[in-house]
Every structure is written in structure tokens, then in C-alpha cells.
A protein has these predicted regions:
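Extracellular Ig-like/FN3 beta-sandwich strand-entry sites
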Residues: 75-79
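Intrinsically disordered, low-complexity PEST-like regions enriched in Ser/Thr and acidic residues
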Residues: 1-4
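Calcium-regulated, polybasic anionic-phospholipid
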Residues: 6-59, 88
Length: 124
């Protein structure tokens, strides 16, 4: 009989308040990407994108509708990264958009508090 690590599928809801306005004539058009730090077979780690929200047009306080699915593994420390960008074009390359900030935490923090609130860092 094989041992299975306890795991649950969860869906992350994301919102932000008081984002920096990077647009001149209108408000920012934010999108949030969600990544998890994954351990590779060679022992190294890399950020793997789990998904992204939709763009919320003309908003500094977006409440994103699209939920991000991920597997919560009870016995692992799963580091998460949330990055918010101001979408400025139809390009799918994030480097073509203004970076508004990021936040890192462990998935267990989100699950245990049910509503985690943290400041963004890396604002330019």
C-alpha cells in the first residue's frame, strides 16, 4: 500500500487596495499573477506560475473574480508569490507592463487565517 501525502484542492480569491496609479489619463488596469516555489528533482527550486487573474480595468482597488486553483499539501511549506502589474497593451509578456508590486507568503498562512492581508513590496 502506497502512502499518500494529505492534499486539498483550494481556490485563491485575490483583491488589492490602494494600488499605485501608473497611468496618466486613467487609473491603472491591474492583473495579478500567482506562482509557487517548486522543488526540482535536482534539489534546486524555481517559481512556477499557477495562474493569473483577469484584468480589472481602471481600478486602484481591484477585486478579482477569477479564482486561482492550487493544491495545498499539508506537510509541505509551499511558498507563494503574488505579483501585480498595470496592463498597458495587449501583450502577454509581463515585462511590457508596469510592475506595481509583489507579496510573498506561505500557503499555510492563507489557509490558517482564511483572509491574509499583506503590503506589496518592490513598488517602483
Amino acid at each position: 500500500m502506497a502512502f499518500q501525502t494529505p492534499c486539498a484542492k483550494i481556490f485563491l480569491s485575490i483583491k488589492a487596495n490602494g494600488l499605485k496609479d501608473r497611468d496618466v489619463l486613467t487609473r491603472s488596469d491591474p492583473i495579478c499573477t500567482v506562482s509557487m516555489l517548486i522543488k526540482l528533482p535536482n534539489g534546486k527550486q524555481k517559481w512556477t506560475k499557477l495562474g493569473h487573474t483577469e484584468v480589472v480595468w481602471d481600478s486602484l482597488d481591484p477585486e478579482f473574480v477569477r479564482k486561482i486553483p492550487c493544491d495545498y499539501i499539508f506537510e509541505e511549506r509551499q511558498k507563494m508569490k503574488f505579483e501585480i502589474y498595470d496592463v498597458d497593451s495587449t501583450s502577454s509578456k509581463l515585462s511590457n507592463h508596469d510592475f506595481l508590486g509583489s507579496m510573498e507568503c506561505y500557503l499555510a498562512e492563507i489557509v490558517s487565517t482564511r483572509s491574509l492581508k499583506k503590503e506589496l513590496s518592490g513598488l517602483t
